[in-house]
Amino acid sequence: IAKQFTKSIEIGYFCKKFKKHNFIFLQKTHMSTTQLYEKEVTLQADRRRSGVELIKIISDLWYDKSIELVLFRNHLIDRNVSEILNLHEYAGEFVGKPISILDSVEIASVILSLDLPPSKLDIGKLTYEYGLLDEKYPDARHFVIDKLKEAKTSDEIQPKDVVLYGFGRIGRLLARELMSKTGKGDQMRLRAIVTRDKNDATSLEKRASLLRYDSIHGDFNGSVIADPANNALIINGTTVHMITANTPEEIDYTAYNIDNALVIDNTGAFTTQEALSRHLTSKGTDKVLLTAPGKGVPNIVHGVNQNEYNPDEVNIFSAASCTTNAITPILKAIEDTLGVVKGHLETIHAYTNDQNLVDNMHKKYRRGRAAALNMVITETGAGS
């Protein structure tokens, strides 16, 4: 549309769909500002409708098939339309190429139509690769089928009961994650929380309040109701028993209809194989996971060594330290690509509940100093 522009003609933009990648481009043409605005409104409405459609597919996949869609590792479950669109903008900046929500809807629709096992799929990665390889495939369906052809069928999944042993900072964050990942309830299910202190109506409400809001991580996007009559927390409509115990051995989880449970110890009180084995003497337990570095047990950093141990043969695992999880993936990438001869590691850590707010006596010299001013830590749990 090439004509001489004159002073009497107002230059605007014309919204046009470019078929090749379903991207939306703006083309200069003769159009008034009002017409331009109307086109922009129409375009935005189309994109938001696509966002609604994608949210519906994401929910259907998660609650019907236990398939979770993510966008470059960003969770999409419980997101609203604006957040979905914003994540697509972020994804485009991340890969240096527009990521169209129209393509995402097309690919997600194909995934929904296929018979796939429970899994986590990165729709951002799939959409990006489809944009690069679309000339190789006649349509999105052929592309998705080819990319996921190695997906294996799985036996019927058996739900896994989960018990949080400890309900401090880490325990509450774990509770958030577990409840947000419940889905249709055929994978990990949070059934109970163990604390040393007895729970009455007041303490239960305090624990509920701490779960509802975290000073760093903000609001929990769900409902938490204290149920003193049954000594439980009702989280997102699901009963989670609150159990009081001083030692692991004294608990009978089967009394709460909990069996073959995964016990996640986040207390920091039991860190050796001998100490953690005490959980396995409790009736109703099957596996133990430690949220700190453990001695004499496999320390697992996912993405690095998770395949070195058979979970059918090992009952106790450690998730390693925060420092180890932070540095190991980077070190592995450097080691695999270039090789590492030697190195020096420095870690910066937030102060913890064990430190004093003001100077006071402590069994460790530096931890006796005021936490907010003490920038020299005494030790790290980073594994060698």
Question: Where are the regions that the model predicts?
Answer:
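Generic detection of intrinsically disordered/low-complexity segments and helix-coil linkers/edges
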Residues: 7-8, 17-19, 56, 345
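Short, positively charged and aromatic/hydrophobic N-terminal segments
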Residues: 9, 13-27
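Charged docking surfaces used in two-component/phosphorelay signaling
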Residues: 357-384
